[in-house]
């Protein structure tokens, strides 16, 4: 070796090609990983069916939108309670407070607590006693 610089061997990308490569997420303008979602789709697909790249992008966009929606509502719930950290309780309040998300997410959230609710029949009996 003459020592005039690095010798690149093999089939690796040159520095110019490495700079121009962009991820699927960056091309789609998403934050969530499109490549990982596509890999999960391929792994869970029945009978080795083909998975199109647009389907992975679409699913990633839907997941990102739903996550942003839940986090925005949970952040508002945390802000209303004057705390800076989102807890499972805030997630529970956000999801159960929105009718569409409540229908979509039927799961029980660990350490989420319950929504405060008093049956109207119980309130009427208390009010009648106060009036007498």
UniProtKB/Swiss-Prot annotation:
The places in or outside the cell where this protein is found are:
Nucleus; Chromosome
Kindly give the InterPro entries that the UniProt entry links to this protein: Histone-fold, Histone_H2A, Histone_H2A/H2B/H3, Histone_H2A_C, Histone_H2A_CS
Cite the GO molecular-function annotations of the record.
DNA binding; protein heterodimerization activity; structural constituent of chromatin
Q: Any idea which residues bear N-acetylserine here?
A: 2
Q: Which PROSITE patterns match?
A: HISTONE_H2A
Where do Basic residues bias regions lie?
1-11
Q: Indicate, by first and last residue, each region the UniProt record lists as having compositional bias (Low complexity).
A: 15-26
Give the free-text PTM comment from the record: Acetylated once deposited into chromatin.
Q: Which SUPFAM superfamilies match?
A: Histone-fold
Q: Which GO terms describe its cellular component?
A: nucleosome; nucleus
* Keyword terms of this UniProt record: Acetylation, Chromosome, DNA-binding, Nucleosome core, Nucleus
List modified residues, type N6-acetyllysine.
Answer: 4, 11, 13
Record-linked Pfam families: Histone, Histone_H2A_C
| Renumbered residue ranges of the record's region Disordered | 1-30
Note the subunit structure.
Answer: The nucleosome is a histone octamer containing two molecules each of H2A, H2B, H3 and H4 assembled in one H3-H4 heterotetramer and two H2A-H2B heterodimers. The octamer wraps approximately 147 bp of DNA. H2A or its variant H2A.Z forms a heterodimer with H2B. H2A.Z associates with the VPS72/SWC2 subunit of the SWR1 chromatin remodeling complex. Also interacts with RBP1/DNA-directed RNA polymerase II largest subunit.
Entry function: Variant histone H2A which can replace H2A in some nucleosomes. Nucleosomes wrap and compact DNA into chromatin, limiting DNA accessibility to the cellular machineries which require DNA as a template. Histones thereby play a central role in transcription regulation, DNA repair, DNA replication and chromosomal stability. DNA accessibility is regulated via a complex set of post-translational modifications of histones, also called histone code, and nucleosome remodeling.
Q: Which family does it belong to?
A: Belongs to the histone H2A family.
Q: What is this protein called?
A: Histone H2A.Z
* Native source organism of the sequence: Scheffersomyces stipitis (strain ATCC 58785 / CBS 6054 / NBRC 10063 / NRRL Y-11545)
Taxonomic lineage per UniProt? Eukaryota, Fungi, Dikarya, Ascomycota, Saccharomycotina
Q: Gene for this protein?
A: HTZ1
């Amino acid at each position: 070796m003459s020592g005039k610089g690095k010798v690149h061997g093999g089939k690796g990308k040159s520095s110019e090609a490495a700079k121009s490569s962009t991820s699927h997420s960056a091309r789609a303008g998403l934050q969530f990983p499109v490549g990982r979602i596509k890999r999960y789709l391929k792994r869970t697909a029945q009978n080795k069916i083909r998975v199109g790249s647009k389907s992975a992008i679409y699913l990633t966009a839907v997941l990102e939108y739903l996550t942003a929606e839940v986090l925005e509502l949970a952040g508002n719930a945390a802000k209303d309670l004057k705390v800076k950290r989102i807890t499972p309780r805030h997630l529970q309040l956000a999801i159960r407070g929105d009718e569409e998300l409540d229908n979509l997410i039927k799961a029980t959230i660990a350490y989420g607590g319950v929504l405060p609710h008093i049956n109207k029949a119980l309130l009427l009996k208390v009010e009648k006693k106060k009036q007498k």
